[in-house]
Every structure is written in C-alpha cells, then in structure tokens.
Amino acid sequence: MNKTAIALLALLASSASLAATPWQKITQPVPGSAQSIGSFSNGCIVGADTLPIQSEHYQVMRTDQRRYFGHPDLVMFIQRLSSQVSNLGMGTVLIGDMGMPAGGRFNGGHASHQTGLDVDIFLQLPKTRWTSAQLLRPQALDLVSRDGKHVVSTLWKPEIFSLIKLAAQDKDVTRIFVNPAIKQQLCFDAGTDRDWLRKVRPWFQHRAHMHVRLRCPADSLECEDQPLPPPGDGCGAELQSWFEPPKPGTTKPEKKTPPPLPPSCQALLDEHVI
C-alpha cells in the first residue's frame, strides 16, 4: 500500500473517533491490577495509574483534557526518562497525551493511545519551566521544513537527538514515531551507535513531537503487541520511500466503522457506563 493510501486510512481511523465515545464518561481508573487489554488502536486498560502532575523533571500539558493516565510501566518510563534528561542538564520534558482513565477510543486526535502504553512528548526541552497558561495552550515547535524533506537546521538541537535516543534505548520501548525528516536527521547524526534507530519509525505528521509506544507488559495476557520493526537501522530504501511523490491513481479508501471491542473491554463498558 502506498504512503498516500496509508495516510488516508490513518486519517479515517482518527476521524471515526470524532463521534462521542463512552470512554469519556469514565472519569477515574477502573480498580484492579494493571492490565492493558487489546491492541493499541482498539483496547482499554484496567488499573491505570495517574501520572503525577507535579514533577521537577517534567511538565504535563493540557491537563484540562485529563489524558494523563496509563499503565504503571508508562508512568515509570516517563519518570525514568525525564530524570535522565534532567540529570544531563538538557531541560524539562514536556508530556502530551497519554490515555484516558480506562483507555479506549478518543473523540478525536488519536487512533491509538487506547491501552495505556502510548505517550506523546514534545521535541523541545525548555530550560525555563513553562507557565500554567503555556501548558494549557502549548505552542508546538515545528522542526520540519515546509517541503517536508529535512529538518530546519536552526531549530534542530543536539539535545533533541539525545532525547529521542534515550527514549529508544529504554528497555520497555518498542517503537517511537517521528516525522520522516526527523528520522532522516537521526540517521545522519547517529554515527556508529545505531542499534536504537531500529525502534524509531517514520510516520505522517509528528513534526513537533515523538509518539513513544511501550511493549505489552508480560502480565497483561490480553494485550496485543505489534510485530517487531524490521531488522536494521531503517535508514535505507524504506526511509527514502517516504520522500517519493505519491503514485498516480491513488484513491481514497472507503470509510470503515471501528472494529468490535475486545470482549473484556466491552464488559468493562457495560459495567461502568450507564
């Protein structure tokens, strides 16, 4: 499938969620041992943790949206990464969307982030902490040129390279989605230490943030992991294909209805949503 068709599918998956979803009616995590259920784009979570809003190492954006819930592994990853960044004097990590209290489908903005294992992190590391007003209405820093072929050299910083590398080297991380131009710059800058690049995957948009995805926890038996990324650093023909013009004759795919929920997620809704 060519890149344009994939983009349209992703857009449709996201737009399908614009209708109100019952998951927003669940305002607190569902009690129980932490269990990520289903797939990243069709699932839920029991026993989610709340990411502490106050931290000396990170700041949470758009707290009014209440998308700061996730599996305990995700909360620990954020704390671990932000502590590393702080100890290296790189700046403050800016945390975007994680998931809702019970996971599930959003009413817009995301097709995934449903099992408590995804987090968006801004690709900027301010040295001065943001104000409450800045956090509620964050200004994204677009690192990619207008033509999408490279990063903006005046905006690309070594600290951003290090932030992505630190995240990719974490044992629990299975994928990091960034814009193809950002992946390309990482390939240029990586030198001989390249194993971590395998986890960094080019994807549409993602011009100002990285989307970090964790592997399924070992004790979440109903969690569906993705296959591992292809072997290698992903800096060759696959990456270059993202910069090729779309093939003629690309047609818009038919709009698809969301798939049925995993039975455990449907049971959760039946119990907790009137």
UniProtKB/Swiss-Prot annotation:
Its EC number is 3.4.24.-. Zn(2+) 1 binds at residues 110, 113, 120, 211. One of its GO terms (cellular component) is outer membrane-bounded periplasmic space. InterPro entries: Hedgehog_sig/DD-Pept_Zn-bd_sf, Peptidase_M74. Zn(2+) 2 binds at residues 147, 150. NCBIfam families: PRK09429.1 (NF006947). Murein endopeptidase that cleaves the D-alanyl-meso-2,6-diamino-pimelyl amide bond that connects peptidoglycan strands. Likely plays a role in the removal of murein from the sacculus. Belongs to the peptidase M74 family. This is Penicillin-insensitive murein endopeptidase.
